[in-house]
Protein backbone atom coordinates (compact mmCIF):
# COMPACT_ATOMS: atom_id res chain seq x y z
CA UNK A 1 0.00 0.00 0.00
CA UNK A 2 2.74 2.44 0.99
CA UNK A 3 4.76 1.77 -2.17
CA UNK A 4 1.70 2.38 -4.35
CA UNK A 5 1.02 5.72 -2.66
CA UNK A 6 4.64 6.82 -2.91
CA UNK A 7 4.56 6.12 -6.64
CA UNK A 8 1.73 8.61 -7.20
CA UNK A 9 2.19 12.34 -7.84
CA UNK A 10 2.09 14.51 -4.73
CA UNK A 11 -1.25 16.18 -5.57
CA UNK A 12 -2.91 12.74 -6.01
CA UNK A 13 -1.46 11.46 -2.72
CA UNK A 14 -2.94 14.51 -1.04
CA UNK A 15 -6.44 13.84 -2.42
CA UNK A 16 -6.29 10.18 -1.36
CA UNK A 17 -4.95 11.19 2.07
CA UNK A 18 -7.81 13.63 2.60
CA UNK A 19 -10.34 10.95 1.64
CA UNK A 20 -8.73 8.40 4.01
CA UNK A 21 -8.76 10.97 6.83
CA UNK A 22 -12.42 11.73 6.15
CA UNK A 23 -13.26 8.04 6.50
CA UNK A 24 -11.08 7.72 9.60
CA UNK A 25 -12.75 10.56 11.47
CA UNK A 26 -16.31 10.28 10.15
CA UNK A 27 -16.81 6.50 9.98
CA UNK A 28 -19.29 5.06 9.11
CA UNK A 29 -19.79 6.67 5.71
CA UNK A 30 -21.51 5.57 2.53
CA UNK A 31 -21.65 6.51 -1.11
CA UNK A 32 -20.26 8.35 -2.93
CA UNK A 33 -17.00 8.19 -0.92
CA UNK A 34 -17.22 4.66 0.51
CA UNK A 35 -18.74 1.49 -0.93
CA UNK A 36 -19.21 -1.91 0.70
CA UNK A 37 -17.59 -4.74 -1.29
CA UNK A 38 -18.83 -7.57 0.94
CA UNK A 39 -16.72 -9.87 3.16
CA UNK A 40 -16.28 -6.88 5.52
CA UNK A 41 -14.24 -5.12 2.80
CA UNK A 42 -14.82 -1.50 1.87
CA UNK A 43 -13.43 0.80 -0.81
CA UNK A 44 -12.66 4.50 -0.63
CA UNK A 45 -13.42 6.11 -3.99
CA UNK A 46 -11.04 9.02 -4.65
CA UNK A 47 -11.71 11.20 -7.68
CA UNK A 48 -8.39 12.36 -9.08
CA UNK A 49 -7.95 14.86 -11.91
CA UNK A 50 -8.54 12.49 -14.83
CA UNK A 51 -8.72 9.06 -13.21
CA UNK A 52 -10.14 7.30 -10.17
CA UNK A 53 -8.22 5.71 -7.30
CA UNK A 54 -9.57 3.02 -5.02
CA UNK A 55 -8.27 2.21 -1.56
CA UNK A 56 -9.54 -1.07 -0.10
CA UNK A 57 -9.80 -1.39 3.68
CA UNK A 58 -11.56 -3.08 6.56
CA UNK A 59 -12.38 -2.05 10.11
CA UNK A 60 -10.83 -4.04 12.96
CA UNK A 61 -11.47 -3.20 16.61
CA UNK A 62 -12.42 0.36 15.68
CA UNK A 63 -9.35 0.92 13.50
CA UNK A 64 -9.33 1.36 9.73
CA UNK A 65 -6.77 -0.98 8.15
CA UNK A 66 -5.71 -0.04 4.60
CA UNK A 67 -5.09 -3.14 2.50
CA UNK A 68 -4.60 -2.26 -1.14
CA UNK A 69 -4.78 0.66 -3.53
CA UNK A 70 -5.06 0.89 -7.29
CA UNK A 71 -6.16 3.13 -10.15
CA UNK A 72 -9.53 1.99 -11.42
CA UNK A 73 -9.78 1.26 -15.14
CA UNK A 74 -13.19 -0.44 -15.33
CA UNK A 75 -16.55 0.03 -13.62
CA UNK A 76 -16.21 -3.14 -11.55
CA UNK A 77 -13.53 -3.73 -8.90
CA UNK A 78 -11.07 -6.20 -10.50
CA UNK A 79 -11.22 -9.70 -9.01
CA UNK A 80 -7.44 -9.86 -8.51
CA UNK A 81 -7.39 -6.58 -6.55
CA UNK A 82 -10.24 -7.76 -4.31
CA UNK A 83 -8.53 -11.15 -3.81
CA UNK A 84 -5.25 -9.46 -2.84
CA UNK A 85 -7.08 -7.27 -0.30
CA UNK A 86 -8.80 -10.33 1.21
CA UNK A 87 -5.46 -12.16 1.40
CA UNK A 88 -3.87 -9.20 3.22
CA UNK A 89 -6.90 -8.92 5.53
CA UNK A 90 -6.63 -12.60 6.50
CA UNK A 91 -2.88 -12.28 7.08
CA UNK A 92 -3.46 -9.22 9.28
CA UNK A 93 -6.11 -11.00 11.33
CA UNK A 94 -3.82 -14.02 11.89
CA UNK A 95 -1.11 -11.80 13.37
CA UNK A 96 -3.34 -9.60 15.51
Residue ranges and their predicted role:
Residues 2-52, 60-64, 71-96:
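Basic, Lys/Arg-enriched alpha-helical interface segments
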